[in-house]
UniProtKB/Swiss-Prot annotation:
InterPro entries: RecX_HTH_1st, RecX_HTH_2nd, RecX_HTH_3rd, Regulatory_RecX, WH-like_DNA-bd_sf. One of its GO terms (cellular component) is cytoplasm. Keywords: Cytoplasm. This is Regulatory protein RecX. GO terms for biological process: regulation of DNA repair. Modulates RecA activity. It comes from the Bacteria. The gene is recX. Its main location: cytoplasm. Transmembrane segments: none annotated. It is found in: Cytoplasm. Belongs to the RecX family.
Amino acid sequence: MKITKLEKKKRLYLMELDGQQTSYITEDTIVRFMLSRDKVISKEELTEIQDFAQFSYGKNLALYHLSFKARTEKEVREYLKKYDIDKNIVSQVIANLKEDKWINDGQYAYAIINTNQLSGDKGPYVLTQKLAQKGISKSTIEENLKEFDFSEVAQRVANKLLKKYEGKLPSRALQDKIIQNLTNKGFSYSDAKIAFDDLDSQVDQETTQELIFKELDKQYSKYARKYEGYELKQRLTQVLARKGYDFSDIASALREYL
């Protein structure tokens, strides 16, 4: 078979054989096989050329995808699937990129965890979920998590939450709110509790009383329409307790309020 045309078409080249059969190949393929117009090639050589062309095309696509930011093996595989590249070729591309250090799931996991350590707010459970979704193996995730102490991250998040809620919630509700937020962000309950206990979060009696009276102003008009006397007192006690106030503080406030 003779190459009768070799014409550039955007990123690929159109190779025509005997004026009929056509294939799209990469520039790397032309260089590797020293292809030119009028060159004669065998069927075996054509198969080899086509296989390498697809490999080269897949690798170029993957490198383009990786040029924007680091990706995991799973992300690159999914990207290449969109271009209908043969599975075996995809595996060859992935192996080649891993060998050349373009893909390294371990380094990817370490970088994500390290960035979170410096400026993020996620605990190990949420990070594990996110990295697993990227296709990183459980063993790789666990191996990298062991390199980090999350107590500083938990403390940083707890301090931010304290600034947000202090003076707005009673002591018990403040503790519940901060610990709940920390566990939602992926910290264990024990780590969240330690972070809260290390806070300087004393809500003084005067602040607690102010908060109770503000809440009573809102709730009294609502319940006074339906209840009175002992029943009203019970309803107000229940609603204040649900909001995190201690029964002793509630009883003291109700004696003054009612």
